[in-house]
Amino acid sequence: MGEEGGSVSHDEEERASVLLGHSLGCEMCSQEAFQAQRSQLVELLVSGSLEGFESVLDWLLSWEVLSWEDYEGFHLLGQPLSHLARRLLDTVWNKGTWACQKLIAAAQEAQADSQSPKLHGCWDPHSLHPARDLQSHRPAIVRRLHNHVENMLDLAWERGFVSQYECDEIRLPIFTPSQRARRLLDLATVKANGLAAFLLQHVQELPVPLALPLEAATCKKYMAKLRTTVSAQSRFLSTYDGAETLCLEDIYTENVLEVWADVGMAGPPQKSPATLGLEELFSTPGHLNDDADTVLVVGEAGSGKSTLLQRLHLLWAAGRDFQEFLFVFPFSCRQLQCMAKPLSVRTLLFEHCCWPDVGQEDIFQLLLDHPDRVLLTFDGFDEFKFRFTDRERHCSPTDPTSVQTLLFNLLQGNLLKNARKVVTSRPAAVSAFLRKYIRTEFNLKGFSEQGIELYLRKRHREPGVADRLIRLLQATSALHGLCHLPVFSWMVSKCHQELLLQEGGSPKTTTDMYLLILQHFLLHATPPDSASQGLGPSLLRGRLPTLLHLGRLALWGLGMCCYVFSAQQLQAAQVSPDDISLGFLVRAKGVVPGSTAPLEFLHITFQCFFAAFYLALSADVPPALLRHLFNCGRPGNSPMARLLPTMCIQGSEGKDSSVAALLQKAEPHNLQITAAFLAGLLSREHWGLLAECQTSEKALLRRQACARWCLARSLRKHFHSIPPAAPGEAKSVHAMPGFIWLIRSLYEMQEERLARKAARGLNVGHLKLTFCSVGPAECAALAFVLQHLRRPVALQLDYNSVGDIGVEQLLPCLGVCKALYLRDNNISDRGICKLIECALHCEQLQKLALFNNKLTDGCAHSMAKLLACRQNFLALRLGNNYITAAGAQVLAQGLRGNTSLQFLGFWGNRVGDEGAQALAEALGDHQSLRWLSLVGNNIGSVGAQALALMLAKNVMLEELCLEENHLQDEGVCSLAEGLKKNSSLKILKLSNNCITYLGAEALLQALERNDTILEVWLRGNTFSLEEVDKLGCRDTRLLL
């Protein structure tokens, strides 16, 4: 049934106190009041853990509210706690008001007992009815037995009251001490051999528990040590290069953190996800699985996932947040996978995180007893070489098993159930299997524009430096686009002198940026008198052996899914102390205690960069092998290849240690990053640099030709896999993330000829790239290719991270877009105004979908200008933004001069009556608009009157959506008058508008004179069941 947790958090205690302090807790609690508070009661019963729920059952059983048969019905293994809580409420409600009152009292007793346990009454140890007394004093007996079940079982077995099998069943490691005590009492209830009398007598002799274990000195000492340990690990932010140590408090900058929304769920349109604070990680509603314990944070490489966890650890250790957890255990997945020996939960927590100096048994039991006060964090799940599976079940917290089985069962809740777990990962590593066990999923999207600026100001407090850097970024959109990932912002900060002094162009591609940081490190490792200006061939050639050693190590690590390197592995790769001193290898974070300090690359992207460098320049790499990198005939994708024996770097002479084998075994998302870097290194831009370092220019030319051929072939294969269009329809394709990386590789190579060739093969009418982690850098790559399309395309980029900077990157391809969908992309007025400024000159662009962004009245003038100037524009969807009456009035001016618009979406804004009036006046004589949505805009009867006048005049509008307003009967009566004179409207949606039978009657009278209208939606209004039946019979066009 899982581990218990007798304590609840401060927030939960407060909520419970508020609920129990209301009328439900008094003697006058009625069944109606009980039912009205059902959702709050369910939340209360499941807010702590299974221990709190079972404590409530103890009290109800002792008061005979529940019969023995009722009680047994709540002990079905594997049932979610929320299901059990609802079943308990149903059972109690059916028993009447007295039972409802008793459940409230039981919840009060259980809450009080969790905070300050006390002995409730006493009993006669020589009772004539021992089984009945065991039941009536059950809560106190469970508390007495808590730490003495083992001894009591041994004694009962010696006396012959229980069998060895029964002892083993009660001792199963999945049960906590309290659960074992309850199962012993349950056994005594059904056995008629004297066990009940034996327990009643001997439990009386046990010592009374004086205090919660949480208050014990041993526990407090361990908690203090754990806080100190976590604080020491998280107080300072080691920069990627390890060259400087910054106080995390001084440098930490909030990232854009959003909760993942299931767009497939039914219900009203959702607003764009709000940017959350870290402190909301465990309190956000909208759970994927209410019974799961694991919180997932996904983000691209370099988006700041590790730093976010470090911030969480620091806030907890400093006592500033997350204080509902008494124990926080941080782990790194790249460190965990290095553990070859089997280990248990106890070994993991104590030997690989924080060792208790005294009382190890008591402290571990405490963790098992109170899992809801425990938080475990696992950073970098994408770097864990074992793929998640739920096939191997492991439920014992003391029995050792493999590290992957241990981790997977922790995430599923088979171990330390009710303990919170936080996992960070790149999106590609999260499978559908894992998502089944996720409570809440968050997207970490990197820095906002304000975040980039704030970070640079925190890094550079010298007068003027930050201002100059920010101006440089704002003037260089490609570089600005890269910086939304914190790792690039760090690079810009690190190389600020080089960037500000550069006379040529600023870095444009990812490869440019990494070569700049390489130059920075090489210059700082070179004596001042011999250092040249910039990354010249002589500088690179002088350290080429070092770079190749690092590249060989990086490539081997990718092939082996190894990201932390021991001294032996460094030696086998011929990495010398001089190579290490260059600064790209740093001491691994979260080093396993007792081991020698291993090293790791500054960041996973640096490991990929050096692997690409090795592939570009090493004489050991035949050019033909590059096909494995660009997905051209990769046998390593087959299941058989994945089962090949793992190799070791020491056996480099073996067949499996070849470059091909390494590329076949590497994780796909790491190969994609490496491929993009290799394409950039082999570009014409960097040809001269590499040619000076290559003994054979012919070999470099062959590599370059091979990379071009592989890229072109992979794109051709991707395009040929697109199924043909249905007759009469445009060809549509939903591109996958792999396609994005091929486009990014093409962009890194910066060859217009290849881009034009790729565009010729993309013969589609609708290109869909939703949920593909498209940020500003990907937008630049897409525009680089799509601008060469011969036919216009509808480009759909919903649910990505485009932002204002990404919009700017898309402008070069706007001329070939016939429609652009940018739903849920954190775009503000600034980005849209730039987009529209360009769209004024793009005759192909006829549709814009911008709902679920951050648009306000500030963009209304640009929108109005677009409508007034572009007389072939067809659709403008602005739903779920922040536009008010003022913005609607400005937009109405543009509508008056427009003769082409067919679809106008305004749902979920704040236009109110004044905005509705302005739009209605502009649309009265409009000759093309067919669909208008003003759902959820706070429109009342005044706005409805204006819309009714519009309906009386308009002869084109076919659908009007007015749900979720407050039109009421007065507004509906006005609309009914307008319908009497209208001859075009086919669908009128009026759901959820506080309409009564009076308003419906007015609509029926209008429908008698209107044969055009096909549907009137009236769901969610204030009709009785009789009125619904009556109205439906009178006219079937009323949808009730």
From Swiss-Prot:
Stored CDD domains: CARD_NOD2_2_CARD15
Species in which this protein is naturally found: Pan troglodytes (Chimpanzee)
GO annotation, cellular component aspect: basolateral plasma membrane; cytoplasm; cytoskeleton; cytosol; extrinsic component of plasma membrane; mitochondrion; protein-containing complex; vesicle
Subunit and partners: Homooligomer: homooligomerizes following muramyl dipeptide (MDP)-binding, promoting RIPK2 recruitment. Interacts (via CARD domain) with RIPK2 (via CARD domain). Following RIPK2 recruitment, RIPK2 homooligomerizes via its CARD domain and forms long filaments named RIPosomes. Interacts (via CARD domain) with ubiquitin; inhibiting interaction with RIPK2. Component of a signaling complex consisting of ARHGEF2, NOD2 and RIPK2. Interacts with ANKRD17 (via N-terminus). Interacts with HSPA1A; the interaction enhances NOD2 stability.
Residues holding ATP: 299-306
Start and end residues of each CARD domain: 26-122, 126-218
LRR repeat copies, ranges: 791-812, 816-839, 844-865, 872-884, 900-920, 928-949, 956-976, 984-1005, 1012-1032
Stated family: Belongs to the NOD1-NOD2 family.
Name by which UniProt lists this protein: Nucleotide-binding oligomerization domain-containing protein 2
Positions of S-palmitoyl cysteine lipidation: 395, 1033
Free-text activity regulation comment from the record: ADP-binding promotes an inactive closed conformation.
Positions annotated to bind ADP: 239, 252-253, 302-307, 603
Entry membrane topology: Lipid-anchor
Pfam families xref list: CARD (PF00619), LRR_6 (PF13516), NACHT (PF05729), NLRC4_HD2 (PF17776), NOD2_WH (PF17779)
Record remark: domains: The ATG16L1-binding motif mediates interaction with ATG16L1.
Gene3D superfamilies: Death Domain, Fas (1.10.533.10), P-loop containing nucleotide triphosphate hydrolases (3.40.50.300), Ribonuclease Inhibitor (3.80.10.10)
Gene: NOD2
Chain positions of motif ATG16L1-binding motif: 63-77
Function: Pattern recognition receptor (PRR) that detects bacterial peptidoglycan fragments and other danger signals and plays an important role in gastrointestinal immunity. Specifically activated by muramyl dipeptide (MDP), a fragment of bacterial peptidoglycan found in every bacterial peptidoglycan type. NOD2 specifically recognizes and binds 6-O-phospho-MDP, the phosphorylated form of MDP, which is generated by NAGK. 6-O-phospho-MDP-binding triggers oligomerization that facilitates the binding and subsequent activation of the proximal adapter receptor-interacting RIPK2.
Keywords: Adaptive immunity, ATP-binding, Autophagy, Cell membrane, Cytoplasm, Glycoprotein, Immunity, Innate immunity, Leucine-rich repeat, Lipoprotein, Membrane, Mitochondrion, Nucleotide-binding, Palmitate, Repeat, Ubl conjugation
SMART domains reported in the protein's UniProt record: LRR_RI (SM00368)
Signal sequence residues: none
Localization of this protein: Cell membrane; Basolateral cell membrane; Cytoplasm; Mitochondrion
Modified how: Palmitoylated by ZDHHC5; palmitoylation is required for proper recruitment to the bacterial entry site and hence for proper signaling upon cognate peptidoglycan detection. Palmitoylation promotes localization to the cell membrane. Palmitoylation protects from SQSTM1/p62-dependent autophagic degradation. Polyubiquitinated by TRIM27, leading to proteasome-mediated degradation. Polyubiquitinated and degraded following muramyl dipeptide (MDP) stimulation, conferring MDP tolerance and preventing septic shock.
